């Protein structure tokens, strides 16, 4: 290995150690605790070394932001793969979005500004467009040909995102209250039977009377910490969105 190659490899290793240390700090202490000085102390390098790899803390946050969106996009694509209709794709993506949020809280908080301000550059990353495209493609396929009045797919994407983010935020930021409500409600399933999960979605967007439990619903139960009511609301939100387009 030549000198140039060795320097490149060493630079990549230092950059990776900076990100690894930053992520460990976020996991143990939260995003507000992250600082260039603390990262430098953790990896035993000087502050100028950190700045030689990242212009500022926002540059580090941007790196995590992009990675988070790549993870989310892959989850959404996996969820919609092999589905028989756009209704099923949207339903599956809604559950995948929820699951991602609670299994990757730190990423989600950063990506969507939950408890931490997002930098302006994060709003212009190409991964945002990929996220938009993954959902909008299914929305376009869902819109009946010649529907009057015309449906704007981008507007519907914004509506879907707003509904999903709002539901996640309520449950993530007010977990204790949500748990109390769920307990008081007796943890009802979709059909009023405890433990019943998400079912398949017919053309009219309504939840069928005899739902079956799916991997998505099981993941949601374990990730959120309060099932039943949260699942009922999640399914209602997604199905109402679908019905609003197809009817």
Annotate each PLM feature.
Residues 119-145, 154-159, 228-240:
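Amphipathic alpha-helical packing segments from all-alpha helical-bundle domains
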Residues 17, 21, 25-59, 63:
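Helix-turn-helix
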């Amino acid at each position: 290995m030549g000198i140039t190659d060795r320097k490149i490899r060493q630079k990549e290793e230092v950059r990776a150690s900076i990100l690894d240390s930053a992520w460990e700090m976020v996991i143990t202490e939260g995003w507000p605790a992250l600082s260039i000085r603390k990262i430098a102390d953790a990896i035993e390098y000087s502050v100028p070394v950190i700045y030689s790899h990242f212009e500022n803390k926002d540059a580090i946050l941007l790196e995590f932001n992009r990675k988070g969106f790549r993870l989310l996009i892959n989850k959404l694509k996996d969820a919609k793969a092999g589905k028989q209709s756009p209704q099923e794709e949207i339903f599956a993506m809604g559950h995948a979005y929820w699951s991602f949020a609670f299994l990757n809280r730190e990423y989600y908080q950063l990506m969507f500004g939950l408890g931490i301000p997002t930098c302006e550059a994060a709003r212009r990353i190409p991964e945002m467009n990929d996220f938009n495209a993954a959902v909008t493609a299914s929305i376009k396929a869902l819109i009946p040909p010649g529907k009057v009045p015309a449906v704007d797919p981008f507007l519907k994407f914004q509506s879907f995102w707003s509904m999903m983010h709002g539901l996640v935020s309520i449950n993530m930021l007010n977990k204790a209250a949500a748990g109390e409500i769920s307990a008081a409600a007796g943890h009802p399933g979709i059909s009023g039977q405890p433990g019943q999960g998400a079912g398949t979605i017919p053309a009219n967007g309504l939840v069928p009377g005899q739902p079956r439990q799916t991997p998505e619903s099981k993941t949601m139960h374990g990730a959120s910490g309060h099932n039943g009511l949260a699942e009922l609301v999640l399914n209602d939100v997604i199905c109402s969105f679908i019905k609003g387009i197809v009817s």
